[in-house]
Amino acid sequence: MAVCFSGVLSGAVTGVVSGVVSGVVSGAEAPSVVGGDLVEAGRQSIAVRGGAQVFPPMEYQLAFEERFAGPELNRDLWSTSLRVFGRWGDRYHNDSYLNYLSDEDVLLENGHLRLRAEHRSVEGDNPPGVYDYSSGMVSSHDKFSFQYGYIEIRAKFPGGRGVWPCFWLMPQGHQWPPEFDIAEYYAGRRMMHLGLCHGDFPEINWDSDANEDVDFEGAWNTYGLLWTPGRALWIQNGVVKREAKGSHVPSVPMYVILSNGVSSKIGPSGAPDAQTKFPNYFEVEYVKVWQAPDK
């Protein structure tokens, strides 16, 4: 497989296989700030310019960067199936979804990851069945995880009833909860869900919010999460959209999931209708993680 991972800082992340990266990042990648003040976010300071915070925090160092530059997905960093507690199979979640996860729907084109959702008949084996839709997903489980820091993607979300793309984090240790939904788009409702699931199964709790003030569909935007002990900030295009504080904020290493999906009638985006466009694509230009130097 061609290598499409652009670099890591040793010691800042877990689960990265040595010898598979094409470059090593040294020093810090920080935003350029002219003037401004500093405010505290946990133990870290964040630059403020014109009333807007600048992410990542200035002293954070780039720990992980994936730009999907190769012709094929780097299997040393990404899987295309998802084994999560409570799922009905590695390639099918539950009856909130209509799609089966297919490797054919994970594409790298023009320097972007393109996760396709398609209306086609698929015979699956995990679990067995015939599915009317397929879609693509990548997961860094057992390959890359991190505990605290700032994670960001630049992405373009598809639209249409039943369309259900998501950028989320799950715990490396197979348990569930917790879960971070950094940017989960309910396209049928034109709503971006910003969620945190916590508790002890089966007693789970959702700490959720949503916003509808960004042109999500067909436009490139950045989506990020600043995660520090006891605090999380959801950020879109450099603007904080919500905050969670308290002991329910996850404290365990988490891995990255990027997925496109098709909602059933009981799912949050509703079932597809005649106006839903297939194929549709959840496109990602990059995934980056920054961490404080002491991590």
Spans of features found by a protein language model:
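Low-complexity, Ser/Pro/Gly/Ala/Val-rich intrinsically disordered tracts
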Residues: 6-34, 40
